Amino acid sequence: SAINGWGSWWLSSEGVWLYGGWHNVMNGIAGLLNIFCMTGWWAVYASKDGKDMIWPDMIWVYIIVYDIWNFAYTYNCLPTHSWFCGVALLLAPTIAALLWNKGGWIMNRANTLCMWCMFAQVFPLFQETFADGSTKYAWATITTQYADGTMNGIAVGNAVNADPTAMTVVSALALITNAIALIYIVRKSIKTKTNPYKGEIFTDFKYYKDAAARAVIK
């Protein structure tokens, strides 16, 4: 959408009007940084009960910056669905991982994402917002990207009814937080003389210790 609709509206293959700009670029860079915030690749284990995949070094530092980045992505690229595939779908695995399923975030994320995608394709009107701003269900919402709450006057190549302010703010937040997290990881890896990808960085954190206690580590 950044290329096809830079500073103007563009109709995606899903029939959603997108408004491209620097917010897409910032979020794209944040996504690349987020990849490098994943540490401890060689330390992923099965849980002792055999029900979970445990990644002890994927602690709240990564989980939070991932959530911020992914919400910005959905807000930019799936604006009429961002409450569901953004906020709600991100909170589900995060709450579980922070409270009772420590170390199991990535498996929770995969499972909830799969369930949501299957549900949304079977019941698409659950999340649909129509061009006039109306919805089948009251909880479906249209974002402030559409300035007057509708898609009135929108056409390919124009900027009528566009307000990218919120998209710019969340994308900038995603970029800043992921940059801070990566800088912290690099500094910690230098200090501990540890390869952050073959080794583990957050072994001194309580979250790591709680997660590792659930895993079969040989």
Model segments located where?
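Generic multipass alpha-helical transmembrane bundles of integral membrane proteins
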Residues: S1-G103
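C-terminal transmembrane-bundle signature of multipass membrane proteins
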Residues: C85-K218
